[in-house]
Curated annotation (Swiss-Prot):
It is an enzyme of class 2 (transferase). This is UDP-N-acetylglucosamine 1-carboxyvinyltransferase 2. Its main location: cytoplasm. The modification 2-(S-cysteinyl)pyruvic acid O-phosphothioketal is found at C118. It catalyses: phosphoenolpyruvate + UDP-N-acetyl-alpha-D-glucosamine = UDP-N-acetyl-3-O-(1-carboxyvinyl)-alpha-D-glucosamine + phosphate. The keyword Transferase applies. One of its GO terms (molecular function) is UDP-N-acetylglucosamine 1-carboxyvinyltransferase activity. SUPFAM superfamilies: EPT/RTPC-like. The active site is at C118. Belongs to the EPSP synthase family. MurA subfamily. Phosphoenolpyruvate binds at K22, N23. The keyword Manganese does not apply. Gene3D superfamilies: Enolpyruvate transferase domain.
Length: 421
């Protein structure tokens, strides 16, 4: 079993480069199926979710050239066929549901195992099902999978109102509708940068998507799509994770390859705490920060504070002075990091799905386990802050979403290693 071991309490300095966005690339790779051609993706992070997606694509018949050291995937989908996808790989991957939209759009049918990923409480796919049904597909629920197929000759554009703002459902609807007949309008669409990124790729492939990044998206379906080249946007969640770490333990750290506009609400909270920042065109310098103030955080859909960043910022909050709270309105059960931080000495608890902390706390190294991707990131930061040695298990969650995390942290002075036990 692989574990991460951190000897904490050491200040850090230097530069941390940000990789391509995990939450984009997990949709971009399935989206290439729509092209029936060769698509090149640049800036692809070297994470286990990408490896799983590549393996699934190859099972479907895609020919893929991988150079993840340079962040490049060349995907030829001309030989792809719609076939039942392997339950094991699908079950480990939340974003597997994007295969539904892509396969339905190109082939008019899809059979995909039920998605897995991190256990953050209920994340129903009802919105996806409702959208596919509105476009003219029916669902047949099987034991460990769902089968979708078009009723009639093809999907047909329509107006779809999202009852809840959902990134996954917005992207999935966009993928399927891009090959439907006529106009599809998505109302109450999610507005995340990753949606714009996916729309940019499929537009470059010949789709006609307008309004991505607003709450109304219009998609005019096309009969066929072609190859393209696309560079993945920087990962705003990885950037936020390292910004919080730099604020907690940095003696001057530069986070490179950042789009500031994607992180405005997060950066506003750092500044409210008293973190010193210099914002440049594509980088952010975090100055040594002391006498931090506690803040209250509520995660909401973009452009508000991202749910994926409420866990990574928590160790920084534990260095501030005063009492504060964290409320996650997206995933109320996203609190599994709390008992692990308490094990390290944090004065933190959960009350009615609200996280309450009293700070500052002196953290001490301990044996802890990552229960999901962003909880794992929080524990890495906590281990760097803590005195003594921290040993983190279940690190496969962390490797799902953080590209070369050991190497990046080692380069700025963190005593961290990956071990086999």
């Amino acid at each position: 079993m692989k574990k991460i071991v951190i000897n904490g309490g050491k200040r850090i300095s230097g530069t941390i480069p940000i990789s391509g966005a995990k939450n984009s690339v997990v949709a971009l790779i399935p989206a290439t199926i729509l092209a029936n051609d060769v698509v090149t993706l640049e800036g692809v992070p070297d994470i286990s979710d990408v490896a799983s997606l590549v393996e699934i694509m190859e099972i479907m018949g895609a020919k893929i050239e991988r150079n993840l050291e340079e962040g490049r995937l060349v995907i030829d989908t001309r030989s792809v066929v719609s076939r039942p996808l392997p339950y094991g790989k699908i079950n480990s991957l939340r974003a597997s549901y994007y295969f539904n939209g892509a396969l339905l759009g190109r082939f008019g049918q899809a059979t995909v195992g039920l998605p897995g990923g991190c256990d953050l409480g209920p994340r129903p796919t009802d919105l996806h099902d409702k959208a596919f049904k509105a476009l003219g597909a029916k669902k047949i629920q099987e034991e460990e999978a769902e089968h979708l197929e078009v009723i009639g000759d093809s999907l047909v554009g329509t107006t779809i109102y999202m009852d809840v703002v959902s990134v996954g459902a917005t992207i999935n609807t966009m993928l399927a509708a891009s090959r439907a007949k006529g106009l599809t309008i998505i109302e109450n669409a999610a507005r995340e940068p990753e949606i714009i990124d996916v729309a940019t790729l499929i537009n470059n492939m010949g789709a006609q998507v307008r309004g991505a990044g607003t709450d109304i998206i219009r998609i005019t379906g096309v009969d066929e799509m072609h190859g393209a080249q696309h560079t993945v946007i920087p990962d705003r969640i990885e950037a936020g994770t390292y910004l919080a770490l730099a604020a907690a333990m940095g003696d001057g750290v530069i986070i490179e390859n950042v789009i500031y506009e994607h992180l405005e609400s997060f950066i506003a909270k750092l500044e409210e705490m008293g973190v010193g920042l210099t914002i440049r065109e594509d980088s952010i310098e975090v100055h040594k920060s002391e006498n931090l103030k506690s803040v209250n955080i509520t995660s909401v859909p973009y452009p508000g504070f991202a749910t994926d960043l409420q866990q990574p910022i928590t160790p920084l909050l534990l260095k501030a002075k005063g009492r504060g709270s964290i409320v996650d309105t997206i995933y109320q059960k996203r609190v599994n990091h709390v008992p692990e931080l308490a094990r390290m000495g944090a004065n933190i608890s959960v009350l009615d799905d609200r996280i309450i902390y009293d700070a500052p706390n002196e953290l001490t190294g301990s044996c802890v386990q990552a229960t999901d991707l962003r909880a794992g990131a929080a524990l890495v930061t906590a281990g760097i802050i803590a005195s003594g040695t921290t040993k983190i298990s279940n690190i496969e969650f962390i490797l799902r979403g953080y590209d070369h995390i050991i190497e990046k942290l080692t380069a700025v002075g963190v005593d961290i290693q990956l071990i086999e036990e």
